[in-house]
């Protein structure tokens, strides 16, 4: 798990509802099956998800090695083979790309906005407030705030290309705007970047 955060989120405060764990879907790891015993290959992956099968350490017939060095794509033995490393990098990227994430939602004048504000992370509160102030001033404005960055929601391109003007507002030097340009052909947003550690 990689958690991206920023100083505004880390040092801010606000009320939130504590979730009930019972409301979340059950987590069911892909454990090894009895058929795999004595023939277990730790890097064999589920072809649909790209996830490897889990063996509980110490189980007879499922011995394997853990470590941080690159492993053979099937056996799990340490490998320095360049072709294997290339394959493993692609397999890891494909596994992440297969993670299902919800669509990004558009708030405000979602159907007819002249301007779409895009943000992520700790910028949500002040971008939402800015959108509301602009709407009060008679402007048609919408907000798309991203929670998932990799993989991006499947509707990302459709949302971003729907509006005449898109501004990506970030509390950095524009890394998310650059990432979106890389992922979406012919996407040319305006950028609003500040690195002051203060709300916009």
Where are these regions (language model features)?
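Flexible, low-complexity linker and terminal segments
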Residues: 2-200
């Amino acid at each position: 798990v990689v958690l991206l955060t920023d100083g505004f989120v880390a040092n801010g405060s606000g009320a939130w509802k504590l979730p009930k764990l019972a409301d979340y879907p059950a987590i069911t790891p892909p454990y090894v099956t009895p058929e795999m015993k004595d023939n277990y290959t730790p890097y064999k992956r589920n072809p649909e998800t790209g996830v490897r099968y889990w063996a509980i350490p110490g189980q007879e017939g499922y011995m394997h090695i853990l470590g941080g060095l690159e492993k053979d794509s099937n056996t799990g033995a340490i490998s320095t083979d360049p072709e294997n490393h290339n394959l493993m990098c692609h397999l890891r990227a494909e596994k992440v790309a297969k993670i299902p994430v919800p669509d990004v939602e558009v708030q405000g004048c979602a159907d007819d906005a002249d301007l779409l504000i895009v943000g992520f992370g700790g910028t949500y509160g002040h971008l939402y407030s800015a959108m509301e102030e602009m709407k009060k001033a008679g402007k048609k404005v919408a907000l798309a705030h991203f929670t998932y960055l990799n993989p991006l929601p499947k509707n990302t391109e459709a949302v971003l290309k729907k509006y005449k003007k898109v501004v990506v507002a970030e509390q950095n030097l524009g890394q998310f705007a650059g990432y979106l340009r890389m992922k979406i052909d012919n996407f040319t947003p305006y950028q609003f970047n500040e690195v002051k550690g203060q709300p916009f």
